[in-house]
C-alpha cells in the first residue's frame, strides 16, 4: 500500500505532468499551424517545436516513472523494468536539454549585441553552429546510453545481492568502475549546462546594458522598448534558474541512486528535477510575442465561452 508520502508525491507528479503537457502541446500546435499557414518554418519555431515534442515524450516517461516509484518501486529490480525506464528517461532528458541549449544559444546570437569580432563571426555562422551542436548531441547520446546501460547493469547486479556492504567490500574494483561511469555521465551532462549558462548570462548582460542605454536616452524609462527588455530579462533569469535547478537535481539524483537506489528522498529530488520540463514551456510562451498573443486570445475566448454557457440567473 502506498504511504502518505507516496500519495503526495504522485499528486505533485501528476500536477507537474498536466502543467507541462498543456504548455508544450500549445507550443507545438501553434508553431505547426503557423508553419502550415505560412508554408515556411523559421529556425526558432523549428527548435521550439522539436523541444516541445521532446518534452512531451519526457513528461510521459516521467509520469510512468513516478507511478513506478510511488506504487511499485520493487519492479526496478525484480523485473528489470527500471533499466528500460531509466534509459528512456535519459534519452528524452538528453534531447530536451540539448534542444534547450540550442534555443538558448540561438536567442543569444539573435538578441544580444556585442561589438567583439568573435561574437560577430559566430553570429554569422550561427545556423551551422546549431547544426554542429545537434550532431554533437547525437554522438553524446549514443555514448551516454552505452555508459548508462553499463552503469545500470552493474548497479542492478549489486542490488540483487543480499548484503550490499559485504558485496562492496568484496568487489572494490566494481565499485571503482561505478564511480568512473558516474563521473563520465556527470561530465557529459555538464557540456550543455555550461553552454546554456554562458549564453544566457551573456544575453542577460547584453539586455541590462541595452536597457541602461534606453533609460539614458530621451525616450525615458517608460518607453515600450525598455519594458520589453525588462520582460526579456525576467524571462532569461527564470529560464536560467530552472536550468540550474534541473542540472543540480540531476547530479543529486545520480548520487542518491549510486549510494542507495531506494532512498525515500529520491522522490523530492525527482520533483525538483522534473520542474524544468514541466514549467519551462510557460516561460517560453511569455517570452515569445506570437505565443503570448495567441495564449491571450485563447484565454479570452475561453472566458467568453464560459460566460455565455453559464449566464447569470435573473
Swiss-Prot record:
- Localization, UniProt: Membrane
Which molecular function GO terms apply here?
Answer: bitter taste receptor activity; G protein-coupled receptor activity
* Matches recorded under CDD domains: 7tm_TAS2R42
Additional facts recorded = Most taste cells may be activated by a limited number of bitter compounds; individual taste cells can discriminate among bitter stimuli.
Extracellular side, ranges:
1-7, 72-101, 149-187, 260-265
Name of the protein described by the UniProt record: Taste receptor type 2 member 42
Q: Which InterPro entries match?
A: GPCR_Rhodpsn_7TM (IPR017452), TAS2R (IPR007960)
Instruction: Quote the SUPFAM superfamilies the UniProt record gives.
Output: Family A G protein-coupled receptor-like
The answer to keyword Plastid applying to this record is: no
**What is the role of the protein in this entry?**
Receptor that may play a role in the perception of bitterness and is gustducin-linked. May play a role in sensing the chemical composition of the gastrointestinal content. The activity of this receptor may stimulate alpha gustducin, mediate PLC-beta-2 activation and lead to the gating of TRPM5.
Q: Which gene encodes it?
A: TAS2R42
Q: Which organism is it from?
A: Pongo pygmaeus
Residues the record marks as carrying a glycan: 163
Cytoplasmic side, ranges: 29-50, 123-127, 209-238, 287-314
